[in-house]
Amino acid sequence: MPRRREVPKREILPDPKFGNVEVAKFMNVLMLDGKKSVAERIVYGAFDHIEKKANKEPLEIFSTAMGNVKPMVEVKSRRVGGANYQVPVEVRPSRRSALAMRWVREAAKKRGEKSMAQRLANELLEAAEGRGGAMKKREEVHRMAEANKAFSHFRF
């Protein structure tokens, strides 16, 4: 149902340990059934693993990984004259980070390590190096957009 005015964006409070809004958003993406403390434990555990394994600042690795995974373009279906075309469109910044976070979460879930913290740590380390499941997903989306470049004149 249409609304009379635009609903204001909710302000997300920065996470308690690092004071970073991106980390807080990632915790919210990771959270299941409203269990924020569990999500916090997983993320901070992953950051501890990263610190031990890479001897680097975990926030640095996290932001590099997220920057690498963020997609620039994606495809959207557009119906023109009875045919559906996959039209490449640029991704707006808020959606870029949301997709990146979702892809990292899903890639970490599919990994084989014992705890979710370890899976997440290894996925973030790989994404920071430009490999891993989340990067594979990004490349796949970019490939789809590149393949359908011919339909880019069907802009939305």
UniProtKB/Swiss-Prot annotation:
GO terms for cellular component: small ribosomal subunit. Transmembrane segments: none annotated. The keyword tRNA-binding applies. It holds the Pfam family Ribosomal_S7. The keyword Amino-acid biosynthesis does not apply. GO terms for molecular function: rRNA binding; structural constituent of ribosome; tRNA binding. Keywords: Ribonucleoprotein, Ribosomal protein, RNA-binding, rRNA-binding, tRNA-binding. GO terms for biological process: translation. It comes from the Bacteria. Signal peptide: none annotated. Part of the 30S ribosomal subunit. Contacts proteins S9 and S11. PANTHER family: RIBOSOMAL PROTEIN S7. Belongs to the universal ribosomal protein uS7 family. One of the primary rRNA binding proteins, it binds directly to 16S rRNA where it nucleates assembly of the head domain of the 30S subunit. Is located at the subunit interface close to the decoding center, probably blocks exit of the E-site tRNA. This is Small ribosomal subunit protein uS7.
